Amino acid sequence: MELNGVEIEDTFAEAFPIKISRILITAATKRWATVAAQEATGFGTSVIGCPAEAGIEKYADASETPDGRPGVYIQFCTFGFKSLEEQLLERVGQCILTAPTTAVFNGLPDAEKQFDTGRKLKYFADGTESETEVGGRKMHVIPMMEGDFLVEDTLGAVTAIAGGNFFIFGDTQMTTLTAAENAVDAIGAVDGTITPFPGGIVASGSKAGANKYKFLKATANEKFCPSIKDKVEGSEIPADVNCVYEIVINGLDFESIAKATEMGIRAAVAVPGIKKITAGNYGGSLGPHKFNLHDLF
């Protein structure tokens, strides 16, 4: 099938289960909420080499937050609840508590799984901590040099989905980059999803394992590398394609990732010079969740 004259390959993106925690950071200004969110989600591109995948989900107006201040929702993703709890404690403690004017609220208050992250962070106050209530939520108050840091008693987590994806094939690097940027912007409007790679874009799509260097668990996906398309047997790169970017999507449920994939692809194919959209899968061996591209439209 074609969308806006661009081929949409009849294939599927293969995704897998992941544990996700979602939190809300508020601050005196949107700038400082954003700074804290960016710091907390750093080194969070891929579980191939990072302790968690992480990203900004969406911004919240002051009218939408428990303390009436600008906010940012972020997500952290790991394979197990134990490692997720560890990442929450470390990232909130080192990257958000340390940032000016911030507070942290539970982004999944109805989740069955709740971590006592706030209850543990209160010990930083070394006996000067107290409790209060904000918007009906139990908060721990930690006195600090600038004033008080507030963190909700518990932070929730759920079993969700990671690894939704699609590939954008373009005639030039700048054309393809523009399409990828537009795709990420469109996905940003879909609640419950993040694009964890830098700026939401993967420049270095990988394959599982290695052909030559067996000590590596992931290596360059040479069949999708345009600069060696004439040298690699079975290259997936057409003659008129000179750049490929991958968009990876994690989310709280199947429906939100499906919607994000659709919105992202629609935005990408609106850019002149885009030649093809496809997706990455391992024939069903990676995970149970399949996002068939043709079914999205």
From Swiss-Prot:
Keywords tagged on the record: Acyltransferase, Cytoplasm, Methanogenesis, One-carbon metabolism, Transferase
Entry EC number(s): 2.3.1.101
Top-level taxon: Archaea
GO MF, one example: formylmethanofuran-tetrahydromethanopterin N-formyltransferase activity
Gene3D superfamilies associated with the record: 3.30.70.520
Compartments where located: Cytoplasm
GO cellular component term of the entry, any: cytoplasm
Keyword Transferase attached: yes
GO biological process: methanogenesis, from carbon dioxide; one-carbon metabolic process
Coiled-coil stretches noted in the UniProt entry, renumbered to this chain: none
Catalysis performed (reactions): N-formylmethanofuran + 5,6,7,8-tetrahydromethanopterin + H(+) = N(5)-formyl-5,6,7,8-tetrahydromethanopterin + methanofuran
Pathways involved: One-carbon metabolism; methanogenesis from CO(2); 5,10-methenyl-5,6,7,8-tetrahydromethanopterin from CO(2): step 2/3
InterPro entries cross-referenced by the UniProt entry: ForMFR_H4MPT_ForTrfase, ForMFR_H4MPT_ForTrfase_C, ForMFR_H4MPT_ForTrfase_fd-like, ForMFR_H4MPT_ForTrfase_N
Quaternary context: Homotetramer.
Function: Catalyzes the reversible transfer of a formyl group from formylmethanofuran (formyl-MFR) to tetrahydromethanopterin (H(4)MPT) to produce 5-formyl tetrahydromethanopterin (5-formyl-H(4)MPT) and methanofuran (MFR).
Assigned protein family: Belongs to the FTR family.
Alphabetical list of NCBIfam families matching this protein: one_C_fhcD (TIGR03119), PRK02114.1 (NF002554)
Protein's name according to its UniProt entry: Formylmethanofuran--tetrahydromethanopterin formyltransferase
Organism: Methanococcoides burtonii (strain DSM 6242 / NBRC 107633 / OCM 468 / ACE-M)
Primary gene name: ftr
